[in-house]
Amino acid sequence: MAWCRATRSPSWQDSGMERVLGIGGYFMRAADPAALGVWYRDCLGLDADENGLWRQGTGPTVFATFESGTGYFGSRAQQTMLNFRVRDLDAMLTQLRAKGADVAAETQDMEGVGRFGWVTDPEGNRIELWQPA
């Protein structure tokens, strides 16, 4: 397997190197894909079409790596975590609780970054909700 050699300097800025433009999709396995799609639509308002295309609003996207032993994602079996930007975290968490979703009791504030809350989907995937600062 060939790996791209990592460098400490952002050499792509000066080299004319092609760059990715953004996240093009997020794909997950599910025991019942249709039901999980309905959950994301009904609980989070994710309006994807029949092909899964969802036109999201503008805003920042975070790409971060974590130590392999992190407990931040919930279950150790979960290798990635989906994060959605939200306008009003408290309103979203209230809405999710009203729909019977598994919402974590705690929230987290990060100065200059925003507020975070978490919900677990019916397949057991922990999802982070982020209200940017």
Task: Locate predicted features.
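Short alpha-helical
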Residues: 34-35, 90-91, 114
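A generic alpha-helix structural signal
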Residues: 37-40, 93, 97
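Mid-chain, well-packed structural core segment of small domains
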Residues: 75-96
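Acidic di-acidic motifs
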Residues: 32, 88, 121
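Vicinal oxygen chelate
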Residues: 2-28, 94-133
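Conserved short beta-strand elements that form part of the metal-binding/catalytic scaffold
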Residues: 44-79, 119-122, 126-132
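Core segments of cupin and vicinal oxygen chelate
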Residues: 17-23, 27-64
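Secondary-structure boundary/capping motif
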Residues: 35-37, 81, 116
